[in-house]
Amino acid sequence: MVFLLCFFLVADVSYGINGDCELPKVVGPCRASHPRYYYNSSSKRCEKFIYGGCRGNANNFHTLEECEKVCGVRSRDSPKEN
């Protein structure tokens, strides 16, 4: 019984979240100004940020829709603009 409870708790927390979505937002050191979206694991939303153009990571999406699809976010939970 305890095993099943633990299994469902872990499954509920991790459902729909791609590992890349847990990476931190990385603006990068370059000075370009590309509007992008990243998954904020604290707010559990896709949020807008300005990407510098280099040395980012996989938590960097061209559109809100792409971020929500990859990271399993429901549309009503987004967007939050920064």
Curated annotation (Swiss-Prot):
GO MF terms, alphabetically ordered: potassium channel regulator activity; serine-type endopeptidase inhibitor activity; toxin activity
Protein's cellular compartments: Secreted; Nematocyst
Signal peptide: 1-16
Keyword set includes ATP-binding: no
Record-linked PANTHER family: BPTI_KUNITZ INHIBITOR DOMAIN-CONTAINING PROTEIN, KUNITZ-TYPE PROTEASE INHIBITOR-RELATED
Similarity comment: family membership: Belongs to the venom Kunitz-type family. Sea anemone type 2 potassium channel toxin subfamily.
Record's protein name: U-actitoxin-Avd3j
UniProt source species: Anemonia viridis (Snakelocks anemone)
